[in-house]
């Protein structure tokens, strides 16, 4: 009995430590105080400023958010396509080739991100490429691609390797075998890799800071994402208080996506159980 109470207490303590900072941030997004330590005075001033297009800080935050989302979605799509095809190609390659590919994908995951960022900078400078949106996009793809590969690989290993050959024997073309046999079997891993790529891109600062240039919503200026904008503001002083309501918006948007994905996965799992039960009957 005591062990159960301690175990539950430990779990609740961990959850409290995880979510208490977010709850505090939510509360102070409704405070008019610029510094959290200055007390709490209820008001919607920060929310009004954030949604006021005439405010410079609001323009900077929304521009940074737009840049962040564009880079995250585009890089996630590219990483998912390349990582999925790479995992499928490695799965049907010879064992020696599989080991080489496995090693090359493990190195970026275990290596420090600063090493990857510096390597990209050296490569772009060596080939004479001007830093812009495309160099930033390549950096984010390189960052996310190994994680997509590692997300898809376990699903391929769970799949019967003879399914693809059986589809070809039954008259399917290689393209049909890929789209109608392999992709559906690995779809959960592909989707997980896509979400992980978006998360990595949204959260990244080092690769972004080293590989960005002008473009996107920033125009002729250097591309600002939320992470680089916060870092730039920290150099001049405290983080703009208008970031608090923006953080709350992002939190609830991510929460809604997680809830929808969980509901979809549960429905899919239940449908698969019903189908297997009918097949066994």
Where are the regions that the model predicts?
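Short membrane-interfacial helix/loop motifs at transmembrane-helix boundaries
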Residues: 20-57, 212-221, 281
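C-terminal transmembrane helix and the adjacent membrane-cytosol boundary/short C-terminal tail
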Residues: 2-10, 153-164, 168, 178-181, ...
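Non-cytoplasmic
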Residues: 25-34, 140, 148, 189-232
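N-terminal signal-anchor/first transmembrane alpha helix
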Residues: 1-25
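Membrane-cytosol interface at the C-terminal ends of specific transmembrane alpha-helices
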Residues: 130-169, 176-182, 193-197
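Interhelical loop and adjacent transmembrane-helix boundary motif
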Residues: 46-58, 202-267, 274
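Generic hydrophobic transmembrane alpha-helix motif, especially the helices
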Residues: 102, 106-136, 188-192
